[in-house]
Regions:
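Extended intrinsically disordered, low-complexity segments enriched in serine/proline/acidic residues
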Residues: 7, 34-35
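Extreme N-terminal basic, low-complexity initiation segments
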Residues: 1-16
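Conserved catalytic core of sirtuin-type NAD+-dependent deacylases
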Residues: 14, 23, 27, 35-356
């Protein structure tokens, strides 16, 4: 055993929600952070076949058209800061928050095809599991080097009620650290807003047998030890690659890639992100619900609300008569519920908000 396996785990275990699983069909692909609970009436999944390893996703936004802006950004910001205060708002963020950091989204013009892996496949198909880990190992150095953009930094300056993110890149936390460092010992500065990684985070790895968490860098090191010549064999420099939204890299041949087991129980290791058919930890759901329930309204930044994990917060707010603000330059599934709709770039809007 190397020193990697002697490192202390991050936390003891998770308690998981019970969420119905799904059967799916496809051939190849990478992990996608979406749980079975997010499959809506508009998301179709093909029947299970023995060789099928991935989910085929039909975009629930197909046919939707981006609405016009309901108000100017200045008018919306007046509502956020004068009719209410910053602390009244829960903020839900999606992939559009991170595109300016170089993290691609799922629906942009240059987005890769979406053939996401399911948790069932990860459990039962060793070849697909190794394929996933090879792609993830290759993409992690680039993803790890991603830095928060001005949207993250501006939002980190705002004392909002809390941030619920569907992203798995950890950039909200990085932005909070950068803002705190810039403020130094300013005793009058507001405390950082809580951040809930609804779909998990790529910087952690979880054992599917005992729930223990490990630091991703340590797992990355172990993967490198087990596969010292892999990058050279496939002819790709891990530092100079284009990653998919989940931080992995397209690879044609992953045969022979070796994946370590959990050092404590021999179980399967998986990045701590939620796959199709997987379930969101109950404690995480409760934390997100608490933020949304206690807020006076919700601001959606850079999310198409294509999956129910995000859309349900908007639906609940609208049902309770709370104001809904949506900011993104494309259509969303919540547009008809929005009281205030901006079609500006997320970074431009949040910067305007932070300056008021």
């Amino acid at each position: 055993m190397t020193n990697f396996w002697n490192r202390r785990r991050l936390r003891h275990r998770y308690v998981f929600d019970m969420v119905p699983t799904i059967s799916v069909n496809a051939s190849q692909g990478a992990g996608f952070p979406a749980a079975a609970e997010e499959i809506s009436e508009h998301t179709k999944v093909s029947p299970h076949v023995y060789s099928g390893a991935m989910a085929v996703i039909f975009d629930p936004l197909r046919g939707r058209v981006r609405p016009d802006a309901s108000h100017s950004d200045a008018e919306i910001v007046d509502v956020l800061t004068e009719t209410y205060s910053d602390a009244d708002w829960a903020v839900l963020t999606g992939a559009g928050m991170s595109t300016d950091s170089g993290v691609p989204d799922y629906r942009g013009p240059d987005s890769p095809p979406r053939n996401p892996m399911t948790i069932q496949t990860f459990h039962s198909h060793p070849d697909q599991r190794a394929r996933y880990w090879a792609r993830s190992w290759m993409g992690w150095p680039r993803m790890r080097g991603t830095r928060p953009n001005r949207a993250h930094l501006a939002l980190a300056e705002l004392p909002v009620a809390g941030i619920i993110t569907q992203n798995v890149d950890g950039l909200h936390q990085s932005a909070a650290e950068a803002v705190a460092a810039e403020r130094g010992n300013d005793s009058g500065a507001p405390a950082p807003s809580p951040v809930i990684d609804l779909h998990g985070s790529l910087d952690r790895v979880i054992c599917l047998q005992n729930g223990h968490l490990f630091d991703r860098d340590l797992v990355q090191r172990r993967l490198s030890e087990l596969n010292p010549d892999f990058a050279e064999e496939v002819g790709i420099d891990p530092i100079d690659v284009e990653t998919a939204p989940d931080g992995d890299v397209e690879l044609e041949d992953t045969a022979g890639f070796i994946v370590p087991d959990c050092p404590e129980c021999g179980g399967l290791l998986k990045p701590d992100v939620v796959y199709f058919g997987d379930s969101v930890p109950a404690a995480r759901v409760q934390q997100a619900n608490r933020i949304a329930d206690e807020a006076a309204g919700i601001v959606v930044l850079g999310s198409s609300l294509a999956v129910l994990s995000g859309l349900r917060f908007v639906r609940t707010a609208a049902k309770e008569g709370k104001p809904v603000v949506i900011v993104t330059d494309g259509p969303t599934r919540g547009d008809e519920l929005a009281d205030y709709r901006s079609i500006s770039r997320v970074a431009d809007f949040v910067t305007t908000w932070a300056r008021r």
